[in-house]
Amino acid sequence: TYYRGIEYLDIATGKFTHYNKKTVPTLESEQTWTVLDGGDENLYIGHVNSGFSILSLKDRSTKNFRHDPNDPNSLPGDEVSTILKDSYGNIWLGTDGGLALYNSTTQSFVTFKQNRNDKYGTLSTRIFCIKQLKNNKLWIASELSGITILDLKQSQFLSPEQITFEFLREGDDSRSLSNASVRYIYQDSFDNVWLGTWGGGINFISSEPALFTTIDYSPIPTNSNSLNNKIVSSICTDQQGRLWIGTDGGGINVFENNKRVAIYKKETGEL
């Protein structure tokens, strides 16, 4: 909860167990954004502004971690919005200071930042959601940086500086996000991915190729992704694989690799 710690509901009995300052005096804060049951008799807790805690369910002892600007191996931010345990047993945290990987042996953190070899690959410093998809890739939702994708196989063998990321950014075409601020990631039973954004609605990414690909009409002459006329009367391809489309009033539109490369019209003397 936001103000009163953690509530555990036993579905069989309908009773709650409370984890707060009264029952766990060493708990760093009762303000909580997220909780993960690690399956190892520990609760992993992300606080609103008080860092990260690990609560032992055996004896209710805690380990508390805060950001230290003088320690590069400390938690990168004190606001922890999301925690994930991946299929390798790694604990990932999304904070207001970036993406972090917890090292249980050294009780320290590895922070993932921009790859020094990729000037366009910038990781946001504010992470809202982390999900492991069925293809063994980590999807990271962030503020103003869209989706960052990390292949978990990479992270087992490379240092953070060497790891490369994939990115889904905001844009105007059908292959881009409607908004750069992504708050939630969900993969359904059909392997489709749903993204909840802040201001851009829901983005849907199908696991299967579309049944139809359409070439739409646009009144903008410079739009090379579209037809210049709504009425199509004939279609054929040439030996180079280009698509020739005859229209009623727009002449002949020629497409190559899904882009319009030429228009032949009577008015211009080309037909």
Question: Where in this protein do the model-derived segments appear?
Answer:
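Carboxylate-rich, polar loop motifs that coordinate divalent cations or form catalytic acidic clusters
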Residues: 1-271
